[in-house]
Amino acid sequence: MEKRIALIGTGGTIAGQGASDTDLTGYTAGVLGLDEILASVPGTQPYGPYTYTQFSNIESSDITVKHWLDLSKLVQQLVDQDDIGGVVITHGTDSMEETAYFLNLTVHTDKPIVVTGSMRPAGAISADGPINLLQAIQVARTPETAGKGVVVVLNGYIDGARDVSKCNTTNVATFDSPLVGHLGIVQDGIAHYYKASTRCHTKDSEFDVRDLKELPRVVLLTCYGGMDDMVPMSVVATNPDGLILTGLGHGTIPQNVRQITQNTKFPTVRASRTGSGMVSAVPQDTLAGYLVSDTLSPQKARILLMLGLTRTKNLKKLQQFFYKY
């Protein structure tokens, strides 16, 4: 018998409903259950059998660290079962890239894990949820998806969890990997791959959250022209476990902010607000005690630092995580 695909619903626009079929922005996310979403998707039966879990039904902007921990544990339990061949998760697009990266670092498996969603609610004209879910299932059923880590599937494209970003507020072609490009495409019911991530993930990851109930508190602070001292001073005063500084350009930190955030008792990572490119170490980082995010977005750098702090507080070892993952 064919192994089952485990379907997990978390909410989001794919489960949303608007006041009319032309309401593309004022709708309510997380209304429909997973069973109702599936009922709107023709052509899924040949790719079964399935299991179904309604994990949550929320807007993805409301996702919490506890949600990530609980979802990771659920996915791990599922992939550890011999009769499960892969996992498909429906999720809101606003924080999809973060959830996908968290699972990419914390679920230990070779089995396909696919995250999908939609940019238009279920009742909208030309809703993209049904085709995205069908193609996500097709990707999970494609043998070549095994070992690729967590992937995100929308609009016919396959992206790796590490590098994918939401790049448009409303367009259905919102997901891209600006620096490295898509891993592949979905065509005629099959995933076609043209590249793979070279960074460690899933089965090779050293991060294990199965016994954790919380994670270190890491704060993200965005820098901008004309930034005064008040916000960085307030953040430092809360004494977080870690800080991601989203700098300008090549992660550049304004001098006044640097004076406040350098050589703190907690690790501080420089990232960039540009959306693409590498933040590399410079001599001033050693003086300030800063780490660098490599090519991770600020929000993903936050996730990696949270997980890294569960393993070590050594700055050199933490920096190596950013080069490894």
Can you name each region flagged by the protein language model?
Residues 250-325:
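C-terminal non-catalytic interaction/assembly regions of soluble proteins
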Residues 115-187:
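Internal gly/pro-rich beta-alpha loop/helix module
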Residues 21-31, 95, 101-113, 129-135, ...:
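A glycine- and small-aliphatic-rich helix-loop capping segment at beta-alpha/alpha-beta transitions
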Residues 89-111, 253-262:
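Short Gly/Thr/Asp-enriched flexible loops that form oxyanion-binding sites at enzyme active sites
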Residues 1-77, 276, 312:
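ATP/NTP phosphate-donor binding region
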